[in-house]
Amino acid sequence: MASLVLSSLCFTSQKPCSFTSSLRFSLGALTGSRSAAPLTVGFRPVKRRNGRIRVSVYSRASPLVFRDLDADDFRHPLDKQNTLILKAIPGLNELGRALLGTVTEQIMLLENIGTSVLVSKDQLPELHKMMIEAAGILNIESPDLYVRQSPVPNAYTLAISGKKPFVVIHTSLVELLTRNELQAVLAHELGHLKCDHGVWLTLANLLTLGAYSVPGEEQENLEDDCPYGTRINLFRWLRAAELTCDRAALLVAQDPKVVISVLMKLAGGCPSMADQLNVDAFLEQARSYDKASSSPVGNAQTRQLSHPLPVLRAREIDEWSRSNEYRSLLKRATQMNVVEKV
């Protein structure tokens, strides 16, 4: 049975022809463990004043804003190509939203309200400001933001810009990242919403299933009927969609080392060692991986992953940060003023 795509921050292998466990960057599943020891929600360092937790945040120069930014301005070429193919089918976008949006959003709304903390100007206000700022930079309406208790660093969204779009972040992710890094994560999830990845990737999955199913026959193992080449192409699209959203993260962070640091910490970071991690060494590691993986065995290891490996994502965003495409976007941007930042 095909299910809706949830887009998340971590990396995993999935079956694109079934999506029974749904796409979340994987380290954190929506139904994952919630029994871990409580974690403090906040950025380093955390100070207590009058019995309330105060979050100490780090300021940065006023960021650039992309006022007329369109999703296709930063889409990965493969993501753009496949999305255009589906957009060309009359009525498919509207049908997809009608089928996938309202009921699923309502279910997820109840899940989030019942199990997480809803961020607002009165609840974790610094996180609220970070989301508002990131959404403004990417020219998208700010979704609801929830913080959920989990020992697994992750963030995810229902990647449909419907009536109640949302982003969920785990407490352990907040503990692991700096303010700028966490905002880059929020931007990555906003990228999924801006690109409507939930609509297009789920529709691609459903169309693939429909093309290779036989009416009246048992449908439980449709992924087995899905040709190998088709599965590989879907995986390639999934990986390209993640690279698209890493670009959205860079547009908000406006410093490639911030995005690369997020990927490095998700690959092998912890709060106690965060200050010892080296972004340049991680990029050198990516170059070493390129050499080691340029073989049939290396290709076989990655072609059925739904998310690019973290070292490859780091290399890709480093290269895109030096591209004419990125520089062109920066030239179009304007400075965010103080009023907009509030």
Spell out what each predicted region is.
Residues 137, 143-145, 151-183, 190, ...:
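Active-site scaffold of zinc-dependent metalloenzymes
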Residues 244-253, 262, 301-315, 319:
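Active-site-proximal alpha-helical
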Residues 167, 193, 317-320, 324:
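TPR/TPR-like alpha-solenoid repeats
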Residues 2-163, 227, 231-234, 238, ...:
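Hydrophobic or amphipathic, alpha-helical segments that drive membrane association/targeting
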Residues 189-218, 256-257:
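Catalytic Zn2+-binding segment of zinc metalloproteases
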Residues 122, 126, 168-185, 233-239:
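Short pre-active-site segment immediately N-terminal to the catalytic Zn-binding motif
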Residues 131, 169, 188, 245, ...:
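Residue-level signature of catalytic and energy-coupling elements of molecular machines
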Residues 123-126, 134, 138-140, 215-291:
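Short helix/loop segments within enzyme catalytic domains
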